[in-house]
Amino acid sequence: MGSGEEPSQMRRALVDSLAGAISGGISRTVTSPLDVIKIRFQVQLEPTTSWGILRRDVYGPSKYTGLLQATKDILREEGLPGFWRGNVPALFMYMPYTAIQFTVLHKLKTFASGSSRTEDHLDLSPYLSYVSGAIAGCTATIGSYPFDLLRTILASQGEPKVYPNMRSAFIDIIKTRGVQGLYSGLSPTLVEIIPYAGLQFGSYDTFKRSMMTWNRYKYSHLSFGSEDDSVSSFQLFLCGFAAGTFSKAACHPLDVVKKRFQIEGLKRHPRYGAPIESSTYKGMYHALKEIVVKEGFGGLYKGLFPSLVKSAPAGAVTFVVYEYISDWIGCKAGVE
């Protein structure tokens, strides 16, 4: 590699990091209320529906039985700030997470395609997009995981608070479980993130490629032979929306298991239902089996609706903001 290429590649990496961090921060803050509700559903052992046919009264009465009911409950008991519970560690997680993810993704695609131009990356095999997304997701997860753990704990604790802030939760985990405690649940998280990130980025590239093909066809037939394939912001939004929905729906059971591992041993108020004691689950397979046996198959999909309502626009916002911020900063910095 020539010395002249190194500054350009460094600028490209900085552009990807900054664009990824900004898009992740905006997406996370906008969708925080739905994320809090989703987490409350996922860590509730009791049924999350009032439909009798789906109920399995193994643990007792349910705290949350629907999106609207949960919204009213959180608003009444915790006020508006309750919907942004855990948002600070979430930002500390999402901003470096998306920064690392998009940077690694661009590096991998540049290596595979032999070009740093984003347009050339769309010519890659869809399988390479999936693999690149999975590797980028794993790298980003390892780099930001402690904040993911703190976010889940703070978002799920309710009132009265077990931990008043992120600092107190961090110190308590270090004291009681050591540094390794900050990585509780990392293994199931990596098992989840590999298919999730792969599907998210792979499907986004696939949808975007299809949209460009449609644009070429449309303009060549309707616009006097023009073959403009540029993708509009609304089309980018649709691609991100579809990618977020598809990837989250496919991997939701693994996300439920991940959340259960993350809050093992958390002493919440009894009104939030049966606690998840330490060592309740001996591994991912055991957790999946226990959830199905005690909560039914529906237990693996607790929080799916708020998760989809959140993930679809979150994915759309992330990709649209990233594309625009990346292009804008890239133009200012003279980076292709």
From Swiss-Prot:
Transmembrane segments: 11-27, 88-105, 127-150, 182-199, 230-246, 303-322
Compartments in which it is found: Mitochondrion inner membrane
Membrane topology type: Multi-pass membrane protein
One MF annotation (Gene Ontology) recorded for this entry: thiamine pyrophosphate transmembrane transporter activity
One Pfam family hit: Mito_carr
PROSITE patterns cross-referenced by the UniProt entry: SOLCAR
Cellular component GO terms, alphabetical: mitochondrial inner membrane; mitochondrion
Entry's Gene Ontology BP terms: thiamine pyrophosphate transmembrane transport
InterPro entries, per the entry: Mit_carrier, Mitochondrial_sb/sol_carrier, Mt_carrier_dom_sf
Free-text tissue specificity from the UniProt record: Ubiquitous with highest expression in pollen.
Keywords from the named record: Membrane, Mitochondrion, Mitochondrion inner membrane, Repeat, Transmembrane, Transmembrane helix, Transport
Keyword Transport among UniProt keywords: yes
Solcar repeat start-end pairs: 11-111, 124-210, 231-328
Protein family: Belongs to the mitochondrial carrier (TC 2.A.29) family.
Functional description taken from the UniProt entry: Mitochondrial transporter that mediates uptake of thiamine diphosphate (ThDP) into mitochondria.
Protein name: Mitochondrial thiamine diphosphate carrier 1
Organism the protein comes from: Zea mays (Maize)
